[in-house]
Amino acid sequence: MSLLLTVFLIVFVTQLISWIGQNVLLEWAYNLYLRLSRNSLAARQRSLKTEILNNKTELLKTSAQDQFAKWAKLRRSVDKGLAELEKLNSEIATAKSSFSTKFNAVIWALTSGVNLVIGWWYGRKAVFYLPEGWMGPLTWWFSFPFAPRGSVSVGVWSFACKRVLLVLERMVKELFFAETQAKEVPVGFSPSSSSSSTPNPMSKASSGSPSPRRRTTVTVESEDEKS
């Protein structure tokens, strides 16, 4: 496998882990580990939960007054099961914490660790060469820090791959967000049409009742006629 493709795959795997989320991968890996190893603690936890649930159901059906002996026995069984379950959960949490430490170490070794080793081992080698005079005075930057002049170093190639993947990620997110917004807005909806169709209570009130000045004029005219 060429150095160019190797560096790209390492950067791609690193970004893929970042996109999915390391905590999500940890949960998947831990559940797979429990299934493959048939962990006795997990099996005991499932059976104990089922037993406690059955005892609680039976306890609710039992009267404490009419069947006190049976009720007390079920109550002691539920309390004992809950105490054992709490202890078991603590042991499982400790085991999961240990698994998480090992898993994170493996992920770091497969991504950042491998990237550092390749950058150090192939630091003086060229990933590929640029056409002569193509980049002008910036040619030295592409070979930074120790690659031959006129070539692209491992560090610069890794940086370029990461930037391209980040740009693609942003483009996909913007496209997905635009499609989501288009689905949420109803077809043919226009804020101006909705505002124009809404009746104005002030205009209705002004058209339905005379103004105070008009009322005063009418009252004065009627009093003059009487006199």
UniProtKB/Swiss-Prot annotation:
Residues 72-96 form a coiled coil. Its main location: endoplasmic reticulum. It is a multi-pass membrane protein. The chain crosses the membrane at residues 4-23, 108-128, 152-168. Residues 24-107, 169-227 are cytoplasmic. GO terms for molecular function: protein-membrane adaptor activity. GO terms for biological process: tail-anchored membrane protein insertion into ER membrane. Residues 1-3, 129-151 are lumenal. GO terms for cellular component: endoplasmic reticulum membrane; GET complex. It is found in: Endoplasmic reticulum membrane. Residues 190-211 have a biased composition (Low complexity). Residues 184-227 are annotated as: Disordered. InterPro entries: Get1, Get1_fungi, Helix_hairpin_bin_sf. Keywords: Coiled coil, Endoplasmic reticulum, Membrane, Transmembrane, Transmembrane helix, Transport. Pfam families: CHD5. Required for the post-translational delivery of tail-anchored (TA) proteins to the endoplasmic reticulum. Acts as a membrane receptor for soluble GET3, which recognizes and selectively binds the transmembrane domain of TA proteins in the cytosol. This is Protein GET1. It comes from Coprinopsis cinerea (strain Okayama-7 / 130 / ATCC MYA-4618 / FGSC 9003) (Inky cap fungus). The lineage of its organism: Eukaryota, Fungi, Dikarya, Basidiomycota, Agaricomycotina. The gene is GET1.
